[in-house]
């Protein structure tokens, strides 16, 4: 089965980081945490999940920070989440199916649902697709100081309704 490196950038995320990292157990084979200057327990929590916790001086550039995180990943694929992201149990099963499928299909980029709007009950109500899982090949380069994105490359696949941002 392919290996997946979760690459995250964090700062002062002690309230949500443990929940996020707990939901990727079994899916991510490696966890990379890049801390940009936390003053709370974020790094302590990160170290309870991985020994691959790096300091990165904040340069007011999200793309530079994500590129640094991706440069530390060693898996076949690089997966990114924000600390407030949650993968629900039913979505986790879909991700595991996707991981098995990657052995045969090998897309360069897997687009996943990304919730950005919520109703009054906190349920996700507005989505778009983002590049969430990228083959580690040197072409997965983040651009954009704010609202960073990976420049399109290679062949794309769309994951079946995988992952809700900040829900749960």
Which ranges hold each PLM region?
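Acidic helix N-cap motif at the loop->helix transition within catalytic regions
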Residues: 15-18, 40-49
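Extreme N-terminal starter segment of soluble prokaryotic enzymes
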Residues: 1-5
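Conserved donor nucleotide-binding strand/loop of the catalytic core
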Residues: 44-68, 72
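Conserved beta-strand positions in the Rossmann-like core of class I SAM-dependent methyltransferases
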Residues: 32-35, 54
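Short, well-formed alpha-helical segments that are part of the catalytic scaffolds
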Residues: 7-30
């Amino acid at each position: 089965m392919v290996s997946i490196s979760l690459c995250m950038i964090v700062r002062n995320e002690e309230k949500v980081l443990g929940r996020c990292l707990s939901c990727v157990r079994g899916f991510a084979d490696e966890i990379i945490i890049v801390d940009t200057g936390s003053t709370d327990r974020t790094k302590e929590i990160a170290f309870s999940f991985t020994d691959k916790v790096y300091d990165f001086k904040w340069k007011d550039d999200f793309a530079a920070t994500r590129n640094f995180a991706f440069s530390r990943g060693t898996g076949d694929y690089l997966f990114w989440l924000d600390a407030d992201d949650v993968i629900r149990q039913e979505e986790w099963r879909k991700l595991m199916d996707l991981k098995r499928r990657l052995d045969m299909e090998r897309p360069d980029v897997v687009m996943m649902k990304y919730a950005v709007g919520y109703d009054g009950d906190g349920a996700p109500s507005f989505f778009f697709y983002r590049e969430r899982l990228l083959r580690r090949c040197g072409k997965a380069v983040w651009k954009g100081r704010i609202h960073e994105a990976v420049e399109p490359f290679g062949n794309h696949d769309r994951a079946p309704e995988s992952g809700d941002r900040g829900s749960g």
